[in-house]
Amino acid sequence: SRWCQPTKPEDSDGLHLWIATRPTGESHRAGRFCRRLAILPSGGGRQATEPLVVAAAIPRATLIPSGEGEAMRLPAVLPAEVATVSSRGWPDGWRVDAVLKAAAFPGWDPDEQATLGFFAAVVNRRLGQIPLFAPPEYPWDSDPTTWSFLELAD
């Protein structure tokens, strides 16, 4: 069974992404150009059965830019115009598919910055955190130097 709470995305079952839109590879602390997105297989809509994408807090970084020059309070559900997601559930698991537009990352222009810092983990209340790479005891949830780089191509 899934435990997906948009008000508590850090603990919710889902695919969690950490993105740095201006990665330096030097700072051990997530800054204003870092974003954590929780792609939840359910928890949205009137019946809480719809998938959604939630901007979640990164430890030691509680505010992120909203795109309008102010900080956004977290957690914050991303609007469908910038993040579309679908999900499918089975008795023993779930699958999510998501498309994230550049607007999901305030202050990022893909034409100017084609390299992103990237990390991903599956969060599951029964199984714990399952990181893409690096052991669970590493500080990948808050330290961008533990993330890899994505090079975007045309």
Outline where the language-model segments fall.
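Structural preference for beta-rich elements and adjacent junctions enriched in aromatics
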Residues: S1-D154
